[in-house]
Amino acid sequence: MKIQTEVDELGFFGEYGGQYVPETLMPAIIELKKAYEDAKSDTHFKKEFNYYLSEYVGRETPLTFAESYTKLLGGAKIYLKREDLNHTGAHKINNAIGQALLAKRMGKTKLVAETGAGQHGVASATIAALFDMDLIVFMGSEDIKRQQLNVFRMELLGAKVVSVSDGQGTLSDAVNKALQYWVNHVEDTHYLLGSALGPDPFPTMVRDFQSVIGNEIKSQILSKEGRLPDALVACVGGGSNSIGTFYPFIQDDVKLYGVEAAGKGSHTHNHALAIGKGKPGVLHGSKMYLIQNDDGQIELAHSISAGLDYPGIGPEHSYYNDIGRVSYVSATDNEAMEALITFSKVEGIIPAIESAHALSYVEKLAPNMDEKEIIVVTISGRGDKDMETIKQYKENGGEQNE
């Protein structure tokens, strides 16, 4: 079966993607697409990107054999792709560097970004400081409450954080505000979008910058095991760490599992199952799977993890779901939290709650596989930012009512 791995001339993967933006934004989108295509074929740009990934972020990140976790679960050998060890503690910095270098190349002096968990905001603020650019970060009021530490980090790095109380005050609302701001300041400002979403060329750019994850996994597993893994597992919100993990393996005989956040359960209205329970629609400039009611109104997404409560999933993921190339599965709040607690005790690594959704699925997958088989799971970020949430969960006696 032929898999489409690049957008068509209108910016679509199959029927997903496109450029659903107001006319006023089209010149900026066209300018960005052209600049990105030029940069992509420029060896100097690639060199510069790789220089900062190595010297500033600390790449490559290890691919660690999780010996104790493998023993505990029985079955497949489990390797961890350690994106938690990047500077700033998550995968978000890979994309922030790429886009900031592109913005500089385009002569932009200012950046605007949205953030949910605050990790993309922190990565953007870090890079804005490094490259001496102004940054405004829009963040939902609800997320600000959950992620006080990251708000302080962004401000310490010199960014201006603007609270968004529209809607339910989460990531989706922050994206709306960031897009509006960009429309009005497009001459000197680049919109540093943090996930594989939005109008073309954003999903492709973000995927390309994050593909360093999957490319490293490929060379690392070949040198450690002499072959490709049998399965890759990553959590999915908008979908940037997962698309970066999966993309280099799309044409290979490797099973791919994207783990969505089932929140309080798929039988409730409190989940973020864009593929599991959603249907195609348009949001934030792109056609993709969305959680919506019968009238096509976007429903509010819920997850205990601030980075996964987005009501959509990027267009490339939407396409891979339809053609059956990636299996989209899910983990509830409780399943993710229990996996986080187990994994921390067994491996001495406290993952972000987002990443714990992926681990929760590994706990189901590994025991049903042969011990000669190999799973690689992407630990998209570290859990420092989630201490308050984890503490509350444990104080409430663990399992929340579902």
Curated annotation (Swiss-Prot):
Its EC number is 4.2.1.20. Coiled coil: none annotated. The modification N6-(pyridoxal phosphate)lysine is found at residue 92. Pathway: Amino-acid biosynthesis; L-tryptophan biosynthesis; L-tryptophan from chorismate: step 5/5. PROSITE patterns: TRP_SYNTHASE_BETA. InterPro entries: Trp_synth_b_CS (IPR006653), Trp_synth_beta (IPR006654), Trp_synth_beta/beta-like (IPR023026), TrpB-like_PALP (IPR001926), TrpB-like_PALP_sf (IPR036052). One of its GO terms (molecular function) is tryptophan synthase activity. It catalyses: (1S,2R)-1-C-(indol-3-yl)glycerol 3-phosphate + L-serine = D-glyceraldehyde 3-phosphate + L-tryptophan + H2O. The keyword Endoplasmic reticulum does not apply. Gene3D superfamilies: 3.40.50.1100. Pfam families: PALP. Its cofactor is pyridoxal 5'-phosphate. It comes from the Bacteria. Keywords: Amino-acid biosynthesis, Aromatic amino acid biosynthesis, Lyase, Pyridoxal phosphate, Tryptophan biosynthesis. GO terms for cellular component: cytoplasm. Belongs to the TrpB family. Tetramer of two alpha and two beta chains. The beta subunit is responsible for the synthesis of L-tryptophan from indole and L-serine. This is Tryptophan synthase beta chain. The lineage of its organism: Bacteria, Bacillati, Bacillota, Bacilli, Bacillales. The gene is trpB.
